[in-house]
Regions:
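N-terminal presequence-like segments and the immediate start of the first folded domain
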Residues: 1-68, 72-85, 92-143
Length: 143
C-alpha cells in the first residue's frame, strides 16, 4: 500500500511492503520516501510540558500535549503533521497500554493521511523529572 501527501515540487510517499506486517493500527508506516527538491525540517524532541513548563502526571495528557507542541513547532517551519517523514518516540516504562494510547493519538492527529515511518524506544528516564513521553520529527516541505 502506498499513498502520497499532496505537495507542489516534490513527493513524500509512504509504503508498507508485502512481506511485512501491517503497522497502520500502531500509527506508522514501514517506509517514508522523499523524491525531488525538498526542505527538511528537524523538530527536536517535544515533551508534554505546557507553555509554563508544567508536566501533567499522567501519560495520556503528556502525549496529547507533546503532539500539540509538535504541531506548533512544525507550523513555525511551515510544515504540517502530514509532511512528517519520520518520527522517533521515547516512552518511559513502556507498556502495551501506553502503546495503545500513543497509537490512538497519532491516528487521530493524522486522520486519513498515511502515517510516517516511526521508531519507538522504551527508556527508563527522560530529561525532566516526571517526563513520560517525548517525540521528535523529520518533515519534508517544498524547497
Amino acid at each position: 500500500m502506498q499513498a502520497s501527501a499532496p505537495t507542489t515540487s516534490f513527493r513524500l510517499s509512504f509504503a508498507n511492503p508485502p512481506g511485512l506486517y501491517d503497522p497502520r493500527p500502531n500509527g506508522y508506516s514501514h517506509l517514508a520516501m522523499v523524491q525531488g527538491p525538498a526542505r527538511l525540517v528537524y523538530a527536536a524532541g517535544q515533551g508534554g510540558e505546557d507553555t509554563q513548563g508544567y508536566l501533567a502526571p499522567d501519560f495520556a495528557t503528556q502525549v496529547r500535549q507533546a503532539l500539540a507542541n509538535l504541531r506548533t513547532a512544525l507550523a513555525a517551519a511551515g510544515a504540517r503533521p502530514q509532511d512528517v517523514a519520520k518520527l522517533t518516540v521515547l516512552i518511559v516504562d513502556h507498556t502495551q497500554d501506553r502503546l495503545r494510547i500513543f497509537s490512538e493519538q497519532i491516528q487521530a492527529l493524522w486522520a486519513d493521511a498515511p502515517t510516517p515511518a516511526c521508531t519507538l524506544i522504551p527508556v527508563p528516564r527522560l530529561a525532566l523529572d516526571g517526563m513520560l513521553f517525548e517525540i521528535e520529527a523529520t518533515a519534508a516541505v517544498a524547497a
